[in-house]
Amino acid sequence: MKAKIICTFLIVNFITLNMFAQDPVLKSAFNGKNLKGWVVPENNIWWSVENGILRAKSGPDKKGSILWTDKEYTDFVIETDFRYDEGTVDTGIFLRNDKEQIQMGISGSLKRDMTGSPYIVGKKYPVEAQNVKEILKPNDWNTIKVIAIAGYYEVWLNNKHVMSYTSDSYVKTGPIGLQLHPNTEMTASFRNIKIGKM
């Protein structure tokens, strides 16, 4: 089992090096006008578009919501500008399913900012992103980039590498989601959402 994990790690590292050499082309996944290209939740009251900005805002019942891409991805990179606007922001980027994500904002369980850290159902936060407090700009626009190659995840925050993690419970193919966490009052904004396939 240990040999299998080491072998997987070496393969992922090799793929990663090749990926950086090729610089995958990022294409816009958000047109700034409407939610075309995304699966809009039924009775949507959470997601809106105005002046080129995608806003996630809690509803009165604090139900929460996920906005999924209408396309599925295997190995990919996603990059987006984001801003924490109001309330206790707890959001994130789901990676092919709703069991693995890159946290953005305040963790509901830890009650502190865990931006850039992976949240894995059953493992919670197996690692924590580094130097986020020094890098993150409160109440301003920031940029996050997430790379997912099989179960290998890497995160950059404002062009600074903050996290690497390999998951053994990843899903091979699926959509990418933006989360509005339930049981919180919050507003968060996204713009310039771009996705590239590996």
How would you label these PLM feature ranges?
Residues 21-198:
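Carbohydrate-interacting regions of secretory-pathway proteins
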Residues 1-23:
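Bacterial Sec-dependent N-terminal signal peptides
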